[in-house]
């Protein structure tokens, strides 16, 4: 998702000190469930290397991080909050009343099979000043292209 969203300029705009800023590259911040406490950590990981390298780094960082929150999120991240326990048709998050919060939030739920196809609920929440439906459509196309090329049997 990060790779595809980074290819679409509108997903990289943010408000910073009252001004509009376009970041060259956006990294990731995701929730990670600490199974022992059933509390979530917010983990920040630079999006670098291959997908396999990124996943290995992200898993290691999530497991090693002791703090649940390491401070306010920076502007140069995409937020991810997966919910693999439920299949949903709609999800909505509060925005804490911050009108200048332009950090996109991506969610996905529990995948399921229907008509011999694997389906995954996926939600995108964005700031409408920068991202419109056409941009979300471009993201969906890029994600689908990437998924169509992915060899699941090698993983």
Language model features by range: what are they?
Residues 1-28:
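Hydrophobic "lid/gating" helix adjacent to the active-site nucleophile
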Residues 77-82, 87-119:
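Flexible, Gly/Pro-enriched loop and linker segments at secondary-structure and domain junctions
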Residues 1-5, 138-143:
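Structural preference for long, well-ordered alpha-helical segments in enzyme cores
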Residues 125-138:
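Mixed-charge, glycine-accented linear interaction segment located at domain edges/termini
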């Amino acid at each position: 998702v990060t790779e595809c969203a980074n290819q679409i300029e509108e997903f990289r705009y943010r408000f910073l000190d009252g001004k509009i800023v376009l970041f060259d590259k956006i990294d990731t911040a995701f929730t990670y469930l600490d199974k022992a406490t059933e509390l979530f950590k917010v983990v920040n990981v630079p999006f670098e290397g291959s997908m396999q390298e990124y996943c290995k780094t992200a898993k290691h960082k999530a497991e090693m991080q002791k703090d649940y929150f390491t401070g306010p999120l920076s502007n140069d991240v995409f937020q991810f909050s997966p919910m693999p326990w439920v299949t949903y048709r709609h999800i909505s998050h509060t925005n804490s009343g911050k009108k200048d919060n332009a950090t996109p939030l991506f969610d996905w739920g529990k995948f399921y099979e229907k008509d011999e196809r694997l389906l995954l609920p996926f939600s995108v929440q964005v700031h409408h000043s920068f991202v419109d439906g056409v941009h979300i459509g471009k993201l969906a196309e890029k994600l689908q292209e990437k998924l169509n090329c992915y060899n699941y049997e090698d993983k």
